Amino acid sequence: MILARGEILKLIKDGSLGIEPFTEDVVRENGLDLRVGNEYAIYAFENQVIDPCELESTRHLFSIVEAKDGRIIIPPRSFALLTTMEYVKFPRDVIGFCNLRSTLARYGLGVPPTIIDTGFEGNITIEVINNSGNYVVLRPGMRFLHVVLAKTIGEAKYQGKYLGQRGVTPPKGLKGECS
């Protein structure tokens, strides 16, 4: 069951769904519009062979950058890891499906299918892909990520690698997980 504005506001009011900082305009008709944070991550190197199965950490592969002059510039046919301004805390029976706002998609931007798990807590780090041949500018504080909330049947507690993340978080290595 997808949650509409009224149900989302009830979850926020009763403390089940946490959003910090919170402004009511973040709550839309059928989801949340989260805002761009102040930092982003891009690859520090190009033309490297990256094998996630051989890495314990990937921090050395990325440069974490503060938005200069209030702008994040995503080069053509490239991507950046962005973080949300908001720190969210999801209930154990609500999941979030992430999409880019359609206006931004019309400029050639996209995000891969991304789910916010039940019980997740932290800033959302998400890959924003520039599929266009142009440089596209995003600005901290602008609404960019639309999150559709749905109730799950039963509850689950998130125990993943990214619990409690703050700011933009590069991927974790997969060493030990691959056969």
UniProtKB/Swiss-Prot annotation:
Keywords: Hydrolase, Nucleotide metabolism, Nucleotide-binding. DCTP binds at R101, S102, T103, L104, A105, R106, D117, Q165. It is an enzyme of class 3 (hydrolase). One of its GO terms (molecular function) is nucleotide binding. It catalyses: dCTP + H2O + H(+) = dUTP + NH4(+). The active site is at E127. It comes from the Archaea. Its EC number is 3.5.4.13. The keyword Hydrolase applies. Pathway: Pyrimidine metabolism; dUMP biosynthesis; dUMP from dCTP (dUTP route): step 1/2. CDD domains: trimeric_dUTPase. One of its GO terms (biological process) is dUTP biosynthetic process. Homotrimer. Belongs to the dCTP deaminase family. PANTHER family: DCTP DEAMINASE. Catalyzes the deamination of dCTP to dUTP. This is dCTP deaminase. It comes from Caldivirga maquilingensis (strain ATCC 700844 / DSM 13496 / JCM 10307 / IC-167). The gene is dcd.
